[in-house]
Structure formats: C-alpha cells, structure tokens
C-alpha cells in the first residue's frame, strides 16, 4: 500500500493553531471516520486501505507537531517510520519478541534517531536542516540494502506477526480498529498539548523565538521535545505498518515516502488538528480509490497541487476553518463588547518590586557605540521612565536588561544579583517581564490564550500531566484561566476574551501584551513605548493602569515618547542622548532642563 505522491513542494502560509476544532472540520472528520469504518467492511482491499490510512494519519500527526506547530520542516519523517518498521520486523522475526515490546522498541528507536537528527537544528538555519534530513533519508534508504544481514536486503523480512492482547489476535477489522483507537488517543493527546503552554510556546517559536524567550521558554529544550515526540510517533506508526503489511522490503521506503508525509501535513492543513486526517483522505485514500483512472491520476494530482498552492495556501483544514469563521461571524447578532477597565479586577497576590542597579553599561554594534557608560538606579515599586530622542539607546537598554543583547562593558544588578551574561529565558525566570515596540501576540490564539501564555514559567504541571489531563494540570489550567480573565478585565477586554488577537486594533493589542506580562507576576516590568498608537482616552486609561500595577508592588521601567504621560505617572525620569545619560530626576526637574529641551529640539548640548 505505497502512497502515490507528487514530486513538487508547495510552501504554505502560516496556518491557524486549531486549538478548538471548528464545527465544520469536526463534522468533516466525523463523517470520514464513519465512511472509513463502513468502507473497511466492504471487502479485504478496502479494509487494508483504511488500515494503512489510519497508520499514515498517526505518523502525520507526529510530523504536524514538528512542522505545523513548531515550524521545523523535516523531510526525514518517512525514514523514521522506516526505522520503526524495521525495528519491529527484526525484533519480532529474528529475536522472537512480541508485538508490544517491539512497538516500544520502534518508538524508542524513532525517538532516538529524531533527537540526534534534531541537535543540529538548534544551531543551523532551517534550510540547512532540511538538507540534513534529506541526507538522513537517503542514508537510511541505502543502508536497507547495505545491511542485508539485519534487513534482509532486497528480499526484506517476512512473517511479521499481528498484535495480540490477552489472547485476542488483532487481524483484519480488529487491526483496523486497534490502529484507529491509537489514532484517536493520539489526537486527544495532541489536542491537550496544543491547548496548553507547550502548544502556545511551540507556535511562539515558529513565529520567532523572541516572544517565547521573553516568557521564560527554553526554546532549545522545547524544540528537542518536538523532535522526540514526532520521532516516537513515527516509530510507533512504523510498528503498525510492519504488522499490517506482514512483509517489509526496501522498496516500501523510497525517498518519495518521506515527501508524502510532508505533503499530507502541508496540504491537509499545518498546525490544524484535523489536517492529518484531511490530508491522508485527500492524498492517499482518494488517489487509491481512483485507481481505475490511473492513466489520468498524476495529471489530476499535479493540477490539484497547483490549485492548492494558489487558492488554499493554508491547506484543507485551514480553508474549512476560514469558511466556518465567516459563517459564524455572519450569524453573530452583535459585536463583542469592550468593557470598561476594572481596576479592582486583578486580585493577584502583591509582589515585591525588584531593585535595578546599572553601572558603566556600554554596548557596541561594530564600530558604533549605542550605549556609553550608562549608570542608573531604579527603586523597587517605582515607575522609572527612560526618554530621549530617536536613536538615543533607549530600546537597546531594555534589550540589555532583559538579556537579549550582551553587554560590551559594565554591570546589571537585579536585587543585587549580576545578570550580565545571562540570556532572556534565565532573566525572565527571575521575575522580569517585558513588552515590545510592536506587540508580539499570537494572532490566531484568543486573547485569553495569549494572556495564559504569559504564565509559562509559573506553571508546574509536567508535560505528561498536560498530555493526559491529569488532575493537577486541569486544576492549574482552570485557576490560570480565571486569573487571565481577571487581567483582561483590568485592561477592559474581558468581553473579547475568546476573540482572535489578530482582530484587535493596535492599541488594544498593547493592552493584551501588558496583561500577558502581568500574569507572570513580574517583580520588574519593562515597557517599550506602551503609549504608541493610543488615543487620548486610551492614554488616560494606560496611565491609570500603570498606577494600578505600581500599587501591586511591581517595579516599572518604561521607554516612552509621550512626555505628558511620563510627567503624570513617573517617579523618576532618565534622559538618554547619543547613548549617554543627559539628565535624571523627577519629571519636573528633567523637563525643565535646558539641556533636555535642546536635545529634543535639535539644539546644541
């Protein structure tokens, strides 16, 4: 049952995360399950076809986590299915292992190969990694013949047993039902992972890891997790492939076998839970059922791929989701409300503000000195504003405090602890949160999910607890959902909690980003131009919000151009000009300084 595939690749646009499957996708998938079960009962050919379709769907779900959600393109997935297949074949036929121990071995082998394969991805660019996966796939294909003492060479391995449990042998429809049950269980696990801090962090890494690292995510560990999960699932699918086929040969695992899985994910709908099922149905089951039109099948397949690249860049699942979103929007009777800001909504525990001391800080970019000997002190629980002309080094200073830029010279002390040399993940876990000049939200997550993601470093549930929704994970998620909703009420957006963040105007996206930072219970909050793009009314609300955050105990450092806002809320103002401190003091002292006025108006210092 080798799938028919094409030999060209369509690069999709980013798809939505599919955290809650849209209703039309749910209906489509439910219908396909019923059709598959009914078709499998027709005759042995259709039964075998549907069994392999379920196996391919299991394998594709693993690749969907890696490529769809984490954004790491791999051509090696078919090769990992291959090593899992041969692990079960060799263990069961040559060493007499039962199916279940062999399946565990296959999953372990797939996991091990995938992690080793993924290590270079932590340092290489995406396209270099694609080349490595291609080389790995070709190497595995070559070794199937070269290591014929283990693999049987061109003759392959025959007599692979079927699974059995408690004396019941799974064959025919029983094997189809078993694989279908495994696919359903894996879908549930995937749903739980994606609808959690793990899934949100993976999508954040896919969009660029700045946001993820600012939230305390260890991006390297999470990428390795994606590789490990994907490889283990591929190996497990290989075990079922070996058992269903009964005989495995190198011809089953040509290079296009790996390309097939990438097509299933990309064209079925990357980062959509329903994508693998739709992809397998469209690009494996349908071509097999059209075998009578074999003469024209490749033409139709090529035309179909071209049509997908032009008209359905988000894949089948993405197209269904978009249509469903529009349908539901037309049925909505009223727009979502933007509620007044509730200053008493955030009943989080007070925090102890963090003290910051900077001494002789300098930053060089090539031959340009962006910061030159900056020294300042920020008192715990205060609002400290950093102002100055464009290009004076304000954002550079925030990037150095938060660990995104290494210091060329000088010292940064947070509560007396030196943090120069630490990365953003480590500093975030000390209690430092930040926002950015351009809001960095995950556009197709809801506002609630975006805020929840800010609690990444606070959560204590393990990945296993999240995957199987064990009690601690459920209770922690419920508590954080409630806290996120309170913080959205604090910024006046509780009425839009379940809308996609991409639908918000720029100013409200900034407020969501502040709420996301607050759920991490920061001791120090860095705000980069929070007033940019806000109306006068929104500026007043932002000022009230800053005062509320200060009352919680959090220390705020704010880079801002809006002088009136700074003058109304800041305890201390530091003025930077050409990378050096020009003035420091209360807002009244600073903004009445002739040197500051000259710096802003372009006069000589």
Residue ranges of each PLM-predicted region?
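Helix-to-loop junction immediately C-terminal to a conserved catalytic motif
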Residues: 402
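Conserved catalytic motifs of ABC-family nucleotide-binding domains
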Residues: 521
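Transmembrane alpha-helices and adjacent helix-loop boundaries
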Residues: 2-336
